[in-house]
């Protein structure tokens, strides 16, 4: 499965958008990275988020796909996935505690940027 995540960096001196595109391809290798770096439940949530984003990217004019990625359930799932960006690995399991949750919430960055950072970290692209 392929999808592109676009990070919006602002505007240049000509008021043109500055973007950075990250292209992801879920392969056996990236599946192994996801499996090694995450637990089963988290991997399932990540898979759901990636799948819906990829589906929307393939046809952004489809109102059904647009409503799927803007639904409250999807946003909550994406939020849960992003919280693990600052989780710690303890005995081979990702653990989130008060310190990591507080660090995540204090960043106050748009979730799109955080999701981009997380995927780039998992795939070694950034």
Give the label of every model feature segment.
Residues 1-12:
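Short, intrinsically disordered N-terminal pre-domain segments
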């Amino acid at each position: 499965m392929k999808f592109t995540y676009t990070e919006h960096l602002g505007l240049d001196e000509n008021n043109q958008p500055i973007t950075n595109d990250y292209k992801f391809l879920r392969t056996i290798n990236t599946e192994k990275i996801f499996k090694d770096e995450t637990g089963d439940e988290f991997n399932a949530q990540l898979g759901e988020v990636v799948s819906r984003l990829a589906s929307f990217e393939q046809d952004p004019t489809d109102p059904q796909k647009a409503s799927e990625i803007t639904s409250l359930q999807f946003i909550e799932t994406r939020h849960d996935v992003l919280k693990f960006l600052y989780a710690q690995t303890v005995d081979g399991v990702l653990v989130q505690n008060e310190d990591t949750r507080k660090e995540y919430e204090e960043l106050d960055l748009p979730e799109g940027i955080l999701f981009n950072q997380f995927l780039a970290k998992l795939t070694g692209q950034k």
